[in-house]
Every structure is written in C-alpha cells, then in structure tokens.
Amino acid sequence: MSDPQPTAVDVRESVTSSLRVAVNRQIFRGILFSMGATALAMARLGVPQSMIWSFAKLQARNACRALGVRVTIRGKELAAEGGPYIFTPNHQAHIDIAALLGYLPGNNRFASKKELFDEPVLGAVMRTLGMLPVDRDDPMKSIDVLNRALREGHSIIIFPEGTRSRDGRLLPFKKGAFVAAIEMGYPIVPVIVKGTRRVMPKGGYLSIHPGNVEIVVKPPIATRGLDYQDREWLRDAVREIIAEEFSRPIAA
C-alpha cells in the first residue's frame, strides 16, 4: 500500500507552522539584540545592575509571550524567601534561559562556562547582566566567584547537566554545583523545566514553536552540616527529585 497523501489541511498547517517558526526566529533575534544593546547602554549610563536585571527579566517574559511560549511556574513561593539559593534546573533548550530569567523569582545570576565570556559581544552582555564565569579547570576560583554573588544576596542558577540534552532525556549530573553548595553552605533548590524541547528542538537554528512550558520549583535542600563526602549523595538526591517530576506531563 502506498503512503497516504497529505491533505490540503495538512499542507496548510505545515506551511502555517513553518511561517510561524520563521517569524519567531526574527522576533527572537530582534529581542536578543535590543535587550543586549539596551543593557550595555544602561550600564554605560551608570544604571544599577539590579535595574538592568529587572529590565532583562521583563524582556525575557515579553519574548516568551511574543513567541507564543506560555510559561507557567509552580512552587515559586518555596524560593520567595529565605535565600539566597543555588537553583539547579535541568537543561533542554536555549529557551530554558529565557524562561528561567523571566519567571524564576529573585535577582538571580546564571553561572556559565568562562569561555563564553571571551566572545566580544556576548561576553560583554553577560558581564553586564552579572552572569558568573565558571572555570572548570580552577574549581576553587569558581567557588570564590559564586560565593561572592551569594554573599551579595543573589541566588545562582547552575545547570548540573553541564549542557543541553540531545535526545530529551535527563543527562548525568556533574558534581560541581553540589561541591560548591556544600563548600559554601547554601541550600540547593531543584528546578524542573518541561516543554522547552518541544518548543525549541535541538538542531533547528533558533527554531521556536509556540507551546506550553512549565517550571516547577521544589523545596530547598539544606547543605549546612554536609561535607565533601556527601557530594555524590546530594547530587543523586537532587537528580532523583528532578527526574521524578520531569517524567510527569505538564500540568493542565
């Protein structure tokens, strides 16, 4: 039997979807450029970094809305007070960053590999937004950078997988975030991001489809009293919490 031929409705939906993705690509580029340029200009004018971060948060939310990405967050009240915290979300797509920036409560800081800060434009924007360079070859220096931000009252966002998942499955967690949390004595907050892989599939250059994204914040896990020998237990406990929630469908 021959394969069924696409109907006129199928063709129309495919064309409409392709057009929306193309439009979204330009919207995303435009918002990224305008946010970066405005943040740099604000910094040159001496605007406080807290105001620049608030502007970036607003722009991230506006970007999600303009792209047709509907973000909901559950459990944010668990991290609304008592911080600062170390947030450890899973990582499925680049748009995770926009969703977390826009919707996770607080004046937070992303930790990112230091090589990205060497990019002339990207690095300047990241520094302006207060993002934190992490040197995987110098963990003690990285802990010092993170600790300084925490002492200033900023929660930190670290992706424990270290990179985006290629197939949508949760990757093994690296130990760095958990060693840092134990060394510094700040609580870890497991965060689960769902739906972003369908919204922004890996491999498609800035291909963003309208869809639903859910962020789930779990209760903080205290690290005071833990020592270096507990790093693997803490890593595995956090991964288990994230894996259990990640396996559930997005709440209606």
How should each PLM-predicted stretch be described?
Residues 71-75, 95-97, 143-145, 201-203:
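A generic local structural motif
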